[in-house]
Curated annotation (Swiss-Prot):
Together with the chaperonin GroEL, plays an essential role in assisting protein folding. The GroEL-GroES system forms a nano-cage that allows encapsulation of the non-native substrate proteins and provides a physical environment optimized to promote and accelerate protein folding. GroES binds to the apical surface of the GroEL ring, thereby capping the opening of the GroEL channel. Disulfide bonds: none annotated. GO terms for cellular component: cytoplasm. Its main location: cytoplasm. It holds the Pfam family Cpn10. Heptamer of 7 subunits arranged in a ring. Interacts with the chaperonin GroEL. Keywords: Chaperone, Cytoplasm. This is Co-chaperonin GroES. GO terms for molecular function: ATP binding; metal ion binding; protein folding chaperone; protein-folding chaperone binding; unfolded protein binding. It comes from Synechococcus sp. (strain CC9605). The gene is groES.
Amino acid sequence: MAAVSLSVSTVKPLGDRVFVKVSESEEKTAGGILLPDTAKEKPQVGEVVQVGPGKRNDDGSRQAPEVGVGDNVLYSKYAGTDIKLGSDEYVLLSEKDILAVVN
């Protein structure tokens, strides 16, 4: 079996799934103390980089996703599947796990 090379352009979400690049977590506290990786909270904000075709309705048609590529979104803390590509962190979410689009 040949090895598969993963990149953002090769990941195509299915159904109502959304591929999000996770925003960087804070390195320092407000007082200037550096945080070790174990003390950092998991970020809940990221930028949408790929969107699936949408959820299938009962009649077989597709419901268009409410988010699009480039949107910044707030998502549930423990939602999705974490994926690391190179040095960047991503999460593959179901659209229902997205709480809001943020500007």
